[in-house]
A protein has these predicted regions:
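Flexible "cap/lid" loop of the alpha/beta hydrolase fold
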Residues: 1-8
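Catalytic active-site module of serine/aspartate enzymes centered on a nucleophile-bearing elbow/loop
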Residues: 103-145
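Short, conserved loop/helix-junction motifs that constitute active-site signature segments
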Residues: 72-76, 101-108
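Short beta-strand/loop motif that positions the catalytic acidic residue
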Residues: 75, 81-83, 87
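Residue-level signal for the nucleotide or nucleotide-sugar donor/cofactor binding architecture
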Residues: 51, 90, 126
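Conserved alpha/beta-hydrolase catalytic His-Asp/Glu region
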Residues: 12-74
Length: 145
């Protein structure tokens, strides 16, 4: 909608704190008031801080027209995929399919698919300890082939 409207209307819409807040609320799974305030404050501080309307619209178009799965065959290092069980931007089935695309290429021993339960897209806010623990375990493995 921000792209379809004239710039005088579309630009403020893209920077809208109301839209940022609604999006933030829809993506959160936590019920902890302090965490909800923190996430909302982070989104309010950073979501409207893009350089140009054109740039944010280009980024959006790229985000809906390509996926990381397209680049899987080119990845030549072990991969750990952290997936939110209840992510609004992707399903566990889609994530498993993306991970399966990685398994047939060289350097796949030791790779991990990790599902973090009861969390949405905001793993880094809502379950940072669980995510960091999984990453720490993964990075300390011996990946000698």
């Amino acid at each position: 909608m921000g792209a379809a409207l004239p710039e005088k209307i579309g630009y403020p819409l893209l920077r809208s704190q109301l839209i940022t807040r609604v999006t933030s609320e829809l993506m959160m799974r936590t019920r902890e008031p302090a965490m909800r305030r923190f996430i909302n404050n982070q989104h309010a501080a950073y979501f409207g801080s893009f350089g140009s309307r054109k740039g944010v619209l280009q980024a959006y178009k790229v985000s809906i027209s390509a996926t990381a799965a397209e680049f899987a065959p080119q990845i030549q290092v072990p991969v750990q995929m952290l997936v939110a069980e209840d992510d609004d931007l992707g399903t566990p089935q889609t994530a498993r399919a993306m991970f399966a695309a990685l398994e047939g290429r060289p350097h796949s021993p030791g790779e991990r698919f990790e599902m973090i339960p009861e969390v949405g897209h905001l793993i880094h806010y809502e379950t940072p300890t669980a995510a960091a623990g999984l990453i720490a375990e993964f990075t300390h493995e011996d990946f000698t082939v």
